């Protein structure tokens, strides 16, 4: 089960610098300092999404990201079940739509290549007690 399969929202293509500044992600190198550099992944997800239709609409970057994870599992002969967290029914439906996205080998290679250049640490760095509340008290 992949942890945070949509990169805390980054791979949805909806995360902005402003949203990062207002969240706990502001202290994370992958999201704040390297936002622009890591956008190449989102750009590629969007480009691949343009080649797929889900429920009569162009696929979303999130759907492609989830399909990419599942297909990586197939490559290694492992069952992969991404479980993205969400609080909105629309996102649950969107995420389920990823099952209709069947990526080609060429699309997988494109996504694999661009992901090799992601910058910044993936996990949170704990810098003291304030990381939990992000100074919201």
Feature-to-residue mapping (PLM):
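Tryptophan-centric aromatic hotspots in well-structured domains and transmembrane helices
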Residues: 3-4, 68, 115-117, 121
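C-terminal anion-handling pockets and recognition modules
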Residues: 111
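Short Lys/Arg-rich basic patches
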Residues: 22-30
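Eukaryotic N-terminal low-complexity, Ser/Thr- and Lys/Arg-rich leader segments
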Residues: 133-137
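Aromatic-lined glycan-binding groove of carbohydrate-active enzymes
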Residues: 1-23, 60
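Short coil/turn segments at secondary-structure boundaries
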Residues: 124-129
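Conserved short secondary-structure transition element at the edge of the structured enzyme core
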Residues: 5, 33-100
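Cytosolic histidine kinase catalytic core of two-component systems
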Residues: 40, 105-106
């Amino acid at each position: 089960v992949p942890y945070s399969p949509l990169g805390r929202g980054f791979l949805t293509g909806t995360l902005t610098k402003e949203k990062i500044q207002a969240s706990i992600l502001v202290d994370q190198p992958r999201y704040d300092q390297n936002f622009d550099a890591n956008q190449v992944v989102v750009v590629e997800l969007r480009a691949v999404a343009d080649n797929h239709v889900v429920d009569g609409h162009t696929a979303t970057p999130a759907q492609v990201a989830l399909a990419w994870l599942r297909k990586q599992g197939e490559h290694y002969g492992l069952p992969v079940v991404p479980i993205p967290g969400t609080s909105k029914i629309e996102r649950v439906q969107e995420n389920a739509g990823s099952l209709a996205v069947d990526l080609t080998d060429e699309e997988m290679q494109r996504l694999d290549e661009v992901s090799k250049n992601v910058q910044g640490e993936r996990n949170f760095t704990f810098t003291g007690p304030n990381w939990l509340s992000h100074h919201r008290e």
